[in-house]
Design a protein with these regions (language model features):
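PP2C/PPM-type serine/threonine phosphatase catalytic domain
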Residues: 1-219
Length: 219
């Protein structure tokens, strides 16, 4: 297994509120771990939220003696959500902060995936790209009920309104997915900073034409 991670502020925002974590080696009882979180909130609150969520997540996973990957991930995400809510309640400047999160761990032939918000995980398999996670966003709901098309969603004025996030409510709802992998499969975790700007087909092409994962990430 090979992995590569990169984050960039881009040309739109003045501050990068994304954090990434990639470990090919065990984290607690998980054999590996890959995380992307995209913070939100005024001033530096969004930047803090994503970093704090990752910090709590890793702390929880490393201290968990459970062996079931879904239980480990669920417990860690719920802990991060509770801690973000407490920080926001204790510090007025952090009020309203939150973060998306998408993470994956590969156990044997399976990838176990969780997400909250609109950060995504894609599977690239046999030249095809498939979005595994479902966005928790207003425009995704509009697409689901047929109000707008998938293409319209990318440029919709409300594309940044999300319906779930860590730090939004006490009882966070987490989506879980499991994927059977075969040799040659590629997983991509990313925030909306990529998917708002680049189509799925162009993402796939960049990954498949890169000689290495680093080439693909930097393209």
């Amino acid at each position: 297994m090979k992995s590569y991670s990169i984050t960039d502020v881009g040309q739109i925002r003045s501050m990068n509120e994304d954090v990434v974590f990639a470990s090919d080696i065990p984290v607690g009882n998980l054999p590996n771990l890959f995380v992307v979180a995209d913070g939100m909130g005024g001033h530096k609150a969004g930047d803090f939220a994503s970093k704090f969520a990752l910090e709590v997540l890793l702390e929880n996973i490393r201290g968990n003696r459970e062996f079931n990957p879904v239980k480990i991930i669920r417990n860690a995400i719920e802990d991060a959500n509770s801690r973000i809510l407490k920080e926001a309640a204790d510090h007025e400047c952090m009020s309203g902060m939150g973060t998306t999160i998408v993470l994956a761990t590969i156990v044997g032939h399976y990838a176990y995936v969780a997400n909250v918000g609109d950060s995504r995980l894609y599977l690239i398999h046999n030249q095809d790209i498939t979005q595994i996670t479902k966005d928790h966003s207003l425009v995704e709901e509009m697409v689901r009920i047929g109000e707008i098309s998938r293409d319209d969603a990318r440029n919709h004025p409300d594309k940044n309104i999300i319906t779930r996030a860590l730090g939004a409510v006490k009882d966070v709802e987490v989506d879980f997915f499991d994927i059977r992998l075969v040799p040659g499969d590629i997983l991509l975790l990313c925030s909306d900073g990529l998917t708002n700007m680049v189509s799925d087909d162009k993402i796939r092409d960049a990954i498949l034409t890169g000689e290495t994962l680093e080439d693909a990430g930097k393209s």
